[in-house]
């Protein structure tokens, strides 16, 4: 199954590169999150009634606009296949290179259209506008995108110049009140932020935990485990969106964070008999 998925992306690489050249005039492969077997988004998601002035490379879709990270998950799986199975992945290297190049080229281009500099004051890419999954929209430096780029670049190990310009994962502090004692002052807990900023919430995913899984930046035996656990327990959307139904992966995050009982309960709920 993995090989067929890898080959699917590899087969569509020329289309993804042609999309980028045609719409934006720069290098790199732009894969949309959901696409047809010929490599383009389906017409309904691209948008039948698009404003004339709207960017032709974007889907006119409140959920899917700027959602380009999915290919990076496949790039990482390809790289992990080489590590775990000693597989020859040389044929997929152009896919990995071009997928990474898109983010570097595109966000430099967008920054240069807004102002004189391609990078921020710290020498990092400005990943704006972006999307943290389909949930936090019009993001500046989404944590899911940053974790994806950083992890793939570190595993790939051949693009150190690009790795140096990837911004840090954004963090934030959340006030946590003691429900048993209303007199006690709230405590500030440091958590992973969904992004540096965003304009709206459009779905019910939890991209602030994507640095835990699939990207493994945080976890057992790694630095700042408490920050990731704080995110799981105290981030208001992470708590509100928590579920065992469908594609929800809270059970995986709990396991990666060493929350054994939490993971057990979520797994039991996910594997229980459904209503239909």
Task: Enumerate the language-model features and the residues they cover.
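Active-site core of glycosidic bond-cleaving carbohydrate-active enzymes
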Residues: 1-15, 26, 62-84, 90, ...
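Secretory-pathway/luminal and periplasmic proteins that interact with or process carbohydrate-rich
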Residues: 1, 13-19, 102-113, 136, ...
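The feature captures the catalytic groove of carbohydrate-active enzymes
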Residues: 27-94, 98, 104-168
